[in-house]
Amino acid sequence: MTKYIVQGGHPLFGEVHISGAKNAAVAIIPAALLVDGVCRIENIPQISDVTALLKILEQLGANVRFLNRSDVEIDCRHIATTQVSQELAHKIRASYYLIGALLGRFGEAEVSMPGGCNFGGVRPIDQHVKGFAAMGAEVREGDFICAKANGDRMKGANVYLDVVSVGATMNIMMAAALADGTTVIENAAKEPHIVDLANFLNSMGANIKGAGTDTIRIFGVDKLHGGTYAIIPDQIEAGTYMAAVAACGGQVLVRGIIPKHMDCITAKLQEMGVQVEEQDDTLLVRRSGKLRRTNVKTLPYPGFPTDMQPQITVALCLAEGTSIVTEGVWDNRYRYVGELTRMGAQIRVEGRSAVIEGVDHLTAASVQAYDLRAGAAMVIAALAAEGTSEVSNVHYIERGYEDIIGKLRNLGAQIDSVECDETVETRQIG
């Protein structure tokens, strides 16, 4: 196993270029299964979740070829099976997107569900299954999710999501792209990566309207053709580096972003006293004075993203006064708080809220990454803390952040990756 050694207490200066969006890539790669042709996907992030999904596609019979570091060519014309390897599926939570893609193209799917599906007291797959069933599929749940269409193709249907679910919205879109008839998703999620998936599918010949609103209409077509598509920049990666500047101080130019996607994060950081200047596809982020307190509530897009909750919590630990962070998406996303208190943070969790009393500084400690975004928060805390910290279980961080060590070093951070023997049980979120 690997851990990070971080010498903290130094401001960050320089430029960071944002990679392709992880949350878009992990849906668009499975969506390539719907294409009866060769698709070229550009701006793919070099992260372990992407590697795992591409291996799954190869196991199913796809031909996968990297053209360069961030562009990949996928040929799904000769898929040999609709059964996904249990060993491969367990490596990535987003393997459930394979169900919608395989159902949409072949009318059947068998996918072993990853262990992260039941965290926080909620079963996120429920809304996916509801949509598949409405479209005529029989779905059996056990060690595997086995789904089969009633006939050769899925049937268009009206689907109302009981809760706003990004995963269900995207999975139903994929299942409906080649369906017989029109599918309407109501109470749909609106995140940028949902729009990106719809744009990818439309570029390959799908007919999807309304992505980015709460009602999406998918008019089923007979076939999708090959093409070229570039994934959007990663909103959460950009926000993570912005939060790091807030916590550590300094000045960083964040390049290759879509400013509109950053509005909710930018506004909250500005409330805290961070200066953010927008120009074209860049944000100049500066923090020199003391951070101000604020309150944050995570909500579905365009609200403040739940995947940024741990990172901004770290910055608020160093703000003057009392801040309250409320988690409005997941039932339980505060397991990392215990790690921050070991570094001197003053936080108490009350239900869905964390009450934060700002402190002058954090102190170095050995901490663990319990999930992807909390792991990023631990790195930020270690960068801001006085002394040398160790962050373990960093393989979860590498699920969603391309070359985080190299990018932070380019900003002047003193951070190294070393091998170790110890591992800790974790959960996958984000």
What are these regions (language model features)?
Residues 1-430:
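Short, structured segments at the rim of ligand-binding sites
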